[in-house]
């Protein structure tokens, strides 16, 4: 597969009271779009999570952060399949077979410079040194290698596509919560 991973931005949705919602369903839309080869918007991801979990999120309130299990169910509603990996090697091998990952991170801890969005740079300006629980996506192709998509990217201009990262950088990002990197991932496939 020779394609670039399109970001599904959570920024098009409500940010209220200092809370930016919808990273999980936006990342589910990104990963599912990749493996299914079709356009799935962040809004469709949000609707799929509501259908999968039965919970309608109140925007601007930290009331429904996504779990990886929620996102496995969300991907199923979107038409993809998702599972927990056996280990990090399973994550990498699956990526190289056309799967995508959803990765639960402590943003933007361990991010390389190219993976930090303009939104996050502004956020850090207001909250120096702060990190936050966050869902992201990753994929791999022959032409671009590993690609990392943070839904705080705008999805426009230079933030339209995921950024290229090395194997070491992706593993560091996935390790940002302090445990084994595969424990914070799900593998999304057809």
Can you say where each PLM-predicted feature lies in the sequence?
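Active-site-adjacent structural segments surrounding the nucleophilic cysteine of cysteine proteases
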Residues: 1-65, 116, 129, 156-162, ...
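Solvent-exposed loop/turn segments at secondary-structure junctions
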Residues: 18-21, 30, 88-89, 107-111, ...
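Sec/Tat-exported extracytoplasmic proteins
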Residues: 27, 31, 35-36, 75-79, ...
């Amino acid at each position: 597969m020779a394609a670039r991973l399109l970001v599904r931005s959570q920024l098009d949705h409500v940010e209220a009271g200092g809370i930016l919602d919808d990273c999980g369903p936006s990342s589910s839309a990104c990963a599912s779009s990749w493996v299914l080869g079709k356009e799935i918007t962040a809004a469709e991801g949000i609707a799929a999570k509501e259908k999968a979990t039965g919970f309608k999120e109140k925007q601007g309130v930290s009331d429904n952060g996504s779990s990886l299990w929620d996102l496995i169910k969300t991907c199923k509603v979107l038409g993809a399949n998702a599972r927990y990996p056996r280990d990090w090697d399973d994550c990498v091998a699956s990526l190289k077979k056309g799967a995508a990952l959803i990765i639960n991170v402590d943003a933007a801890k361990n991010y390389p410079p190219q993976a930090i969005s303009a939104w996050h740079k502004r956020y850090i300006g207001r909250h120096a040194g702060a990190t936050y629980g966050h869902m992201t996506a990753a994929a791999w192709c022959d032409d671009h290698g590993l690609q990392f998509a943070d839904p705080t990217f705008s999805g426009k201009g230079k933030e339209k596509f995921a950024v290229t990262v090395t194997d070491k950088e992706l593993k560091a990002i996935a390790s940002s919560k302090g445990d084994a990197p595969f424990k914070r991932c799900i593998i999304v496939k057809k």
